[in-house]
């Protein structure tokens, strides 16, 4: 929040160098560092031309490398990554109903549908209304299965509704497909943007999705991250062999990934991402609540920074004209015209 990341990063790198850390050759200025980041440290949408250009500038991970690592993850994680939140939900409900635990099925249903309702209600997509209608239909179907003695019939109807939901074209509802997916891939390799300065890797945290507003995904606890997201941290931990992770400034997203809030296990995404690596997290001092989340789920040690001094400035030029137009529109709308 309001942290000048390039300037802060510049200062941190030079302090590390002064302390004896191997940081290689640093750029001459903050502006030069920012230019390097914009060239080699940016995640891109599915633009083949731009991905081709970047593929020769950044770290790459082969599909084989990632797939071999991915295959070692818990089955429920692999299923959710490949089939999306509804694929996992169907498996959870089927298992709970089969062993006579309807309350567990209801808990799983409530959790997933709450998160998916929030996402779909906010998404800007032509298939939004149809997706919401299908979600309501799926909820009715699953509730009937949980409450009915003839659950098999109800559960048999759910997959066709899930297929219809996934066919709306809203990103991620059907998962990210078989590893390594399609996000940030070029010719079968995953692209991992970033810069290497000696023993320091500096890179942007991958987004949790592309087409959906990042704010809707930031703390969504039912929507799995992309394959590239997991590959990024797999690279840092197991290929770059980092000794610690530094997430510079609020907000990261790894502490808000799906699954448990406390008592994390091997199938929790935050644990998959952070593993046993210490986390160092420069964090604005007024973000105590979310900072605790990062400590609990991300093994983070918080390093507080003060809120920066800010000043309000008056609007000018086109911004002033825009405000006047907005005020005129609001006034006319309020008068019923």
Question: Which stretches of residues belong to each language-model region?
Answer:
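Ligand/cofactor-recognition surfaces for anionic moieties
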Residues: 1-337
């Amino acid at each position: 929040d309001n942290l000048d990341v390039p300037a802060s990063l510049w200062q941190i790198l030079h302090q590390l160098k002064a302390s004896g850390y191997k940081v290689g050759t640093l750029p001459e200025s903050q502006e030069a560092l920012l230019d390097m980041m914009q060239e080699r440290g940016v995640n891109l949408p599915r633009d083949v031309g731009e991905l081709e250009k970047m593929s020769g500038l950044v770290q790459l991970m082969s599909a084989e490398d990632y797939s071999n690592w991915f295959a070692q993850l818990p089955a429920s994680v692999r299923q959710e990554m490949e089939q999306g939140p509804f694929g996992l939900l169907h498996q959870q409900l089927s298992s709970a109903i089969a062993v006579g635990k309807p309350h567990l099925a209801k808990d799983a249903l409530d959790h997933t549908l709450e998160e998916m309702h929030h996402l779909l209600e906010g998404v800007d997509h032509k298939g939004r209304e149809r997706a919401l209608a299908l979600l309501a239909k799926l909820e009715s179907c699953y509730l009937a299965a949980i409450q009915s003695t003839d659950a098999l019939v109800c559960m048999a109807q759910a997959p066709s509704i899930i297929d219809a939901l996934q066919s709306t074209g809203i990103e991620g509802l059907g998962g990210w497909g078989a590893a390594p997916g399609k996000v940030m891939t070029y010719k079968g390799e995953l692209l991992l943007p970033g810069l290497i300065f000696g023993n320091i890797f500096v890179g942007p945290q991958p987004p949790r999705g592309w087409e959906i507003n990042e704010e809707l995904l930031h703390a969504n606890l039912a929507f799995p991250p992309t394959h590239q997201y997991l590959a990024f941290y797999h690279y840092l931990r197991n290929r770059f062999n980092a000794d610690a992770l530094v997430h510079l400034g609020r907000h990261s997203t790894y502490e808000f990934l799906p699954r448990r809030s406390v008592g994390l296990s091997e199938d929790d995404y935050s644990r998959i991402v952070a593993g046993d690596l210490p986390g160092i997290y420069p964090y604005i001092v007024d973000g105590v609540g979310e900072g605790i989340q990062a400590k609990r789920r991300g093994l983070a040690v918080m390093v507080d920074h003060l809120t920066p001094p800010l000043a309000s400035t008056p609007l000018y030029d086109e911004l002033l004209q825009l405000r006047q137009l907005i005020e005129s529109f609001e006034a006319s709308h309020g008068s019923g015209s």
